[in-house]
């Protein structure tokens, strides 16, 4: 999210300037290649999927791959810099014997394959657990890459849209925020923030879903009284979605 913030600052304040603003974004992108950032996946994959696969991008793990893909796509969109399109320009290294070479094209190809290879057209963060919010980053990675390189993301967009309506929308129009991709069951309740943060990430590919979800939130969650905006806060909304704990400073 740090890279997104710097990119938004560049886009809204200094669109003609690259310099250290672009350098800061590159640093954030390349920091993701540090083993301390990505080595967790080999162990999560082992206990969660009973599979030894140290490569952090090949399957699942959209909490790394999707977010990272958007970082690269946003950087290229703003700066016209195609360095990350070169083969091997984004290589994960753990010592001299363990390497996983990638580039923006390969990352986007993996996002497309993981999305279309899932019956939900979404794929897990943690093993088995699918979040529409996280998979929206994979969707946007494909959209960004194809816009910059002349591809067509239509199959991914339509698959995501259909699955969102079919598998991740409650009868009242609110979001099913978490579903188990292996067993199919959903976690019935979820914090409102899951819907709020999803809206802007739906907008590039499926704007009709973004508008519908935002309208429902305004009608059902937000109480507009005069000049005040008062969200309806439930106990569940006090959970910090980063560590799944209650905390008095969660909404400070």
Language-model segment annotations:
Residues 5-130, 135-136, 174-176:
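Extended ligand-binding groove/face enriched in aromatic
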Residues 62, 92-103, 117-251:
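Extended ligand-binding clefts on enzyme/binding-domain cores
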């Amino acid at each position: 999210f740090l890279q997104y913030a710097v990119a938004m600052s560049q886009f809204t304040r200094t669109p003609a300037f690259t310099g250290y603003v672009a350098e800061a974004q590159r640093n954030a992108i390349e920091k993701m290649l540090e083993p301390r950032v990505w080595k967790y996946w080999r162990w999560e994959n082992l206990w969660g999927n009973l599979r030894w696969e140290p490569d952090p991008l090949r399957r699942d793990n959209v909490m790394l791959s999707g977010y990272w893909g958007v970082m690269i796509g946003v950087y290229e969109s703003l700066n016209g810099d195609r360095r990350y399109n070169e083969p091997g320009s984004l290589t994960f290294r753990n010592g001299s014997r363990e390497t996983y070479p990638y580039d923006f094209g390969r990352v986007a190809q993996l996002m497309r394959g993981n999305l279309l290879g899932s019956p939900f057209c979404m794929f897990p963060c943690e093993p088995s657990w699918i979040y529409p919010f996280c998979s929206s980053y994979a969707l946007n990675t494909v959209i960004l890459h194809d816009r910059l390189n002349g591809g067509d993301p239509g199959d991914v967009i339509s698959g995501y849209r259909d699955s969102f309506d079919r598998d991740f929308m409650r009868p009242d129009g609110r979001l099913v925020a978490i579903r188990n991709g292996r067993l199919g069951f959903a976690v019935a309740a979820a914090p409102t923030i899951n819907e709020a943060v999803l809206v802007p990430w739906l907008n590039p590919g499926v704007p009709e879903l973004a508008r519908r979800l935002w309208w429902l939130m305004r009608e059902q969650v937000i109480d507009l009284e005069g000049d005040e905006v008062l969200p309806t806060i439930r106990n569940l909304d006090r959970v910090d979605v980063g560590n799944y704990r209650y905390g008095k400073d969660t909404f400070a």
